[in-house]
């Protein structure tokens, strides 16, 4: 995957910002649903954090029928993800998708490292007040497809594949089913 220019800031300079995705927004089709300006910038690593899945205030996600991705500080661990360059006009749609107004996630500014070791500052999200819970098989699949699509390190992809999902076998929203189908056809 060709790398776009990753210069920039998570904050208020210029007309774009950098967003570090580690969950369902790893998959291009998923992020483009609400944030069409997103352009792949690079694969990056968030040091001293760990990936987790949970239900905000103990309530399962109605969209995904299981725990959704979050990160927490954990010395020695790392989370791999994708840095997307986005127009500032998409900040509100990204915040809405992440449930910022309702308190599901809070906006954080983090420093991530590219494969070349360059440090860049990005906007990201962290879930507050959650109980750990496994993801649905469908949600896990979207994350794994996004990791594969964008070439996250193979060892990290194997860790993602090893995550035990819950046993949900029902349907998820048509919109999410569509992004899974599009992702599958692109990756096959």
Curated annotation (Swiss-Prot):
InterPro entries reported in the protein's UniProt record: G-Glutamylcylcotransferase (IPR017939), GGCT-like (IPR013024), GGCT-like_sf (IPR036568)
Assembly and oligomerization: Homodimer.
Protein's UniProt keywords contain Phosphoprotein: yes
GO annotations of cellular component type: cytosol
GO BP, sorted A to Z: release of cytochrome c from mitochondria
Protein species of origin: Mus musculus (Mouse)
Pfam families: AIG2_2
Protein name: Gamma-glutamylcyclotransferase
Gene: Ggct
SUPFAM superfamilies per the UniProt record, alphabetical: Gamma-glutamyl cyclotransferase-like
The protein's enzyme class: lyase
Keywords of this entry: Lyase, Phosphoprotein
Entry annotation: catalytic residues: 98
GO MF entry, a single one: protein homodimerization activity
Catalysis performed (reactions): an alpha-(gamma-L-glutamyl)-L-amino acid = 5-oxo-L-proline + an L-alpha-amino acid
EC numbers: 4.3.2.9
Sequence positions that bind substrate: 19-22
Functional summary from the UniProt entry: Catalyzes the formation of 5-oxoproline from gamma-glutamyl dipeptides and may play a significant role in glutathione homeostasis. Induces release of cytochrome c from mitochondria with resultant induction of apoptosis.
């Amino acid at each position: 995957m060709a790398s776009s220019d990753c210069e920039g800031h998570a904050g208020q300079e210029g007309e774009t910002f950098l967003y570090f995705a580690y969950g369902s927004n790893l998959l291009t089709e998923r992020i483009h649903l609400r944030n069409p300006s997103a352009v792949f910038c690079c694969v990056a690593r968030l040091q001293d954090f760990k990936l987790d899945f949970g239900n905000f205030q103990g309530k399962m996600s109605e969209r995904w029928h299981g725990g959704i991705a979050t990160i927490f500080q954990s010395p020695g661990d790392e989370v791999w993800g994708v840095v997307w360059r986005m127009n500032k006009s998409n900040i509100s749609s990204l915040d809405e998708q992440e449930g910022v107004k309702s308190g599901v996630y809070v906006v954080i500014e983090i420093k991530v490292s590219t494969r070349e070791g360059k440090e860049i500052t990005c906007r990201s999200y962290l879930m507050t007040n959650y109980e750990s819970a496994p993801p649905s098989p469908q949600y896990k699949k979207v994350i794994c497809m996004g990791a594969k699509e964008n070439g996250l390190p193979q060892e990290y992809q194997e860790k993602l594949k090893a995550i035990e999902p819950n046993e949900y076998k029902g349907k998820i929203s048509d919109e999410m089913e569509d992004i899974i189908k599009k992702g599958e056809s692109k990756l096959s």
